[in-house]
């Protein structure tokens, strides 16, 4: 095999293994006004060029519908096409408007075709609907939810809708709080999904020790709980973050220093390893919510409020991050390998407090779980589960490639060049570094 062919194959393998890192984006601003294509495009461009990062080039959407319309496709799609930002599409599944979500999905496929298809990472049917439908969600006044049977029905409807279209290869999942995922009554939704979306916010876990020093452990443990029930399916981090300002939740203090610590300890190990959409790029335009999670302020800028660079000691190298945020391609999106947590954890995990944002921010409910499975309203003096924010804004996220390890067959015969290359690239999580190492190993075997 020629050297140029080896390099091309290595880079192709790295691209196909690369995960996605980006932010969550609602269809309105924080005052409820609808975002335009220009608004989305400005956000996507800013995310790609954030100082201290290799760029956040993926967007998670909550709805297919443009703000202020019945079922017109969201203008984030043409903005993403212009900016080459990959998309985790979302269909809002609570409140009885799903037919319009399907209509918008069909219209988007017809209007944008291949240009859309090459950007789609996956499709999320709903966001925290199961939590809002739970006893805890009802107690917390979290908003209208949906039962698991209906979510399964909606997932099947989306599968039928995209069958035979440009999006036929898109993996379909559902996003919810980890407490919803570990609830056995929701297991049918897990069965229906190709992947599980995890929302988790230790900041809101105000019935437990939730200082910034506890945050990483709380986050990791709640992810492990979700992994344990995922039945081998990938778990994508669809929402997490720490506020830069706002009220204190028990021991959790909202400030820039703690937001930076959470980014370093939780975000950096995810970036370049697991599909992750951070909350949030900007939530203070034009009104600053309490709490505010935006990593940029009220004025959109590529200069963040705190340092976003990840140190070399983090598990994600700059090279891996560069690979994970390269422009999307057909191989790395539809038909490519997704990247997420797949290893089920046997250890018990502490619960994590989680938050969801509805399309356009009309909902900002927050769910939590504790040993007594009780929920308390945050608007009261007692620590609670509802963030109570009416601000509308979209979230943010980051992503990375999933790690895979190749196993030895025990054969004494020399492995083939193609096997060395494939296994090396896979075992090194699809990073550019992994691709380079794979090439070197392949050349050594010649």
From Swiss-Prot:
It comes from the Eukaryota. The GPI-anchor is attached to the protein in the endoplasmic reticulum and serves to target the protein to the cell surface. There, the glucosamine-inositol phospholipid moiety is cleaved off and the GPI-modified mannoprotein is covalently attached via its lipidless GPI glycan remnant to the 1,6-beta-glucan of the outer cell wall layer. It is a lipid-anchor; GPI-anchor. The keyword Glycosyltransferase does not apply. Coiled coil: none annotated. One of its GO terms (molecular function) is glycosyltransferase activity. It catalyses: Hydrolysis of (1->3)-beta-D-glucosidic linkages in (1->3)-beta-D-glucans. Residues 1-18 form the signal peptide. One of its GO terms (cellular component) is cell surface. Residues 393-416 are annotated as: Disordered. The keyword Hydrolase applies. Residues 424-446 form a propeptide. It is found in: Cell membrane; Secreted, Cell wall. InterPro entries: Beta-glucan_modifiers, Glyco_hydro_17, Glycoside_hydrolase_SF. Keywords: Carbohydrate metabolism, Cell membrane, Cell wall, Cell wall biogenesis/degradation, Glycoprotein, GPI-anchor, Hydrolase, Lipoprotein, Membrane, Polysaccharide degradation, Secreted, Signal. Glucanases play a role in cell expansion during growth, in cell-cell fusion during mating, and in spore release during sporulation. This enzyme may be involved in beta-glucan degradation and also function biosynthetically as a transglycosylase. This is Probable glucan endo-1,3-beta-glucosidase eglC. The lineage of its organism: Eukaryota, Fungi, Dikarya, Ascomycota, Pezizomycotina.
């Amino acid at each position: 095999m020629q050297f140029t062919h080896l390099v091309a194959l290595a880079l192709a393998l790295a691209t196909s293994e690369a995960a996605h890192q980006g932010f969550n984006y609602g269809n309105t601003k924080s005052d409820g006004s609808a975002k335009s294509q220009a608004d989305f495009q400005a956000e996507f461009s800013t995310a790609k060029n954030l100082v201290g990062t290799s760029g956040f080039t993926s967007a998670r959407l909550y709805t297919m519908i443009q703000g202020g319309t019945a079922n017109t496709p969201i203008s984030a799609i043409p903005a993403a096409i212009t900016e080459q930002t990959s998309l985790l599409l979302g269909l809002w599944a609570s409140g009885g408007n799903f037919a319009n979500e399907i209509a918008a999905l069909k219209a988007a496929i017809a209007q944008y075709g291949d240009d859309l298809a090459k950007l789609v990472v996956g499709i999320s049917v709903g966001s925290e609907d199961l939590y809002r439908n739970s006893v805890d969600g009802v107690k917390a006044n979290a908003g209208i939810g949906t039962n698991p049977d209906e979510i399964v029905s909606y997932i099947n409807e989306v599968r039928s809708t995209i069958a035979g279209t440009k999006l036929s290869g898109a993996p379909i999942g559902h996003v919810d709080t980890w407490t919803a995922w570990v609830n056995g009554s929701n297991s049918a939704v897990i069965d229906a999904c190709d992947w599980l979306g995890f929302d988790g916010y230790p900041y809101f876990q105000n019935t437990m020790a939730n200082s910034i020093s506890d945050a990483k452990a709380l986050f990791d443990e709640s992810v492990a709980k979700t992994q344990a029930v995922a039945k081998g399916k990938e778990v994508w981090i669809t929402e997490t973050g720490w506020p830069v300002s706002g009220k204190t939740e028990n021991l959790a203090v909202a400030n820039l220093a703690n937001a930076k610590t959470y980014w370093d300890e939780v975000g950096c190990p995810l970036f370049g390893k697991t599909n992750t959409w951070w909350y949030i790029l900007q939530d203070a335009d034009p009104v600053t919510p309490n709490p505010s999670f935006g990593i940029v302020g009220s004025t959109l800028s590529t200069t963040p409020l705190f340092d976003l660079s990840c140190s070399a000691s983090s598990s994600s190298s700059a090279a891996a991050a560069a690979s994970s945020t390269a422009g999307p391609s057909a191989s790395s999106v539809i038909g490519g390998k997704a990247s997420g947590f797949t290893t089920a954890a046997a250890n018990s995990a502490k619960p994590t407090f989680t938050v969801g944002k509805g399309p356009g921010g009309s909902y900002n409910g927050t769910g939590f779980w504790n040993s007594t499975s009780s929920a308390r309203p945050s608007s009261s003096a007692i620590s609670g589960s509802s963030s109570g924010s009416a601000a509308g804004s979209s979230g943010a996220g980051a992503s990375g490639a999933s790690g895979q390890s190749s196993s030895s067959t025990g054969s004494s015969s020399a492995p083939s060049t193609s096997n060395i290359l494939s296994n090396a690239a896979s075992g090194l999580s699809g990073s550019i570094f992994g691709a380079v190492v794979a090439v070197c190993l392949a050349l050594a075997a010649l």
